[in-house]
């Protein structure tokens, strides 16, 4: 493969990956809510502490993505969300969230209201890291492509 062709391929991949990355930002947030699956897909009576910690994190940093859960965002991942359980999650975790009615009104979900669904008590996040390194799919694809191009280019 000629160097010019490699460059064109790399630029095309970068454009595609930037589009995918923009579309999947909430998908990554939904995936991070995996500890809550047993609560929002089944009728488990209490969510785990890990679920509550993750919910508090999402509310703090990506609350707009919570609307996607209520709007069927879980179905794109093959998950059937029990909407009643999903709406009960903030109260069960004692996490204040913006009202669910804001999801359909078009207003910003990030602006907090006095009338949240849950309590004002938010669980503290653990300060210790689990030691894992998390890469996004676009970054992995770019690294893979760059290494492949380097390997091909080195042969010529």
From Swiss-Prot:
Confined to the anthers of the inflorescence. It is a lipid-anchor; GPI-anchor. GO terms for cellular component: plasma membrane; side of membrane. It is found in: Cell membrane. GO terms for molecular function: lipid binding; peptidase activity. Disulfide bonds join 26-67, 36-51, 52-93, 65-103. Glycans are attached at residues 43, 82, 117. SMART domains: AAI (SM00499). Residues 1-22 form the signal peptide. The keyword Nucleotide-binding does not apply. Residues 112-128 have a biased composition (Basic and acidic residues). Keywords: Cell membrane, Disulfide bond, Glycoprotein, GPI-anchor, Hydrolase, Lipoprotein, Membrane, Protease, Signal. InterPro entries: Bifun_inhib/LTP/seed_sf, Bifunc_inhib/LTP/seed_store, LTSS, Plant_nsLTP. A lipid is attached at residue 128 (GPI-anchor amidated serine). Belongs to the plant LTP family. This is Non-specific lipid transfer protein GPI-anchored 26. It comes from Arabidopsis thaliana (Mouse-ear cress). The gene is LTPG26.
């Amino acid at each position: 493969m000629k160097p010019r062709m490699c460059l064109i391929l790399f630029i095309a991949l970068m454009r595609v990956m930037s589009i995918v990355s923009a579309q999947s930002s909430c998908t990554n947030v939904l995936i991070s809510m995996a500890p809550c699956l047993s609560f929002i897909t089944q009728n488990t009576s209490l969510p785990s502490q890990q679920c509550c910690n993750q919910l508090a994190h999402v509310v703090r940093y990506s609350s707009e993505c919570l609307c996607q859960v209520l709007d069927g965002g879980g179905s794109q991942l093959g998950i059937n969300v029990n909407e009643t359980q999903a709406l009960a999650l903030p109260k069960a975790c004692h996490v204040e969230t913006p009202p669910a009615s804001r999801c359909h009104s078009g207003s910003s979900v990030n602006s907090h209201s006095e009338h949240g669904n849950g309590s004002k008590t938010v669980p503290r996040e653990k300060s210790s890291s689990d030691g894992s390194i998390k890469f996004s799919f676009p970054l992995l694809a770019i690294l893979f492509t760059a290494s492949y191009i380097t390997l091909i280019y080195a042969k010529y």
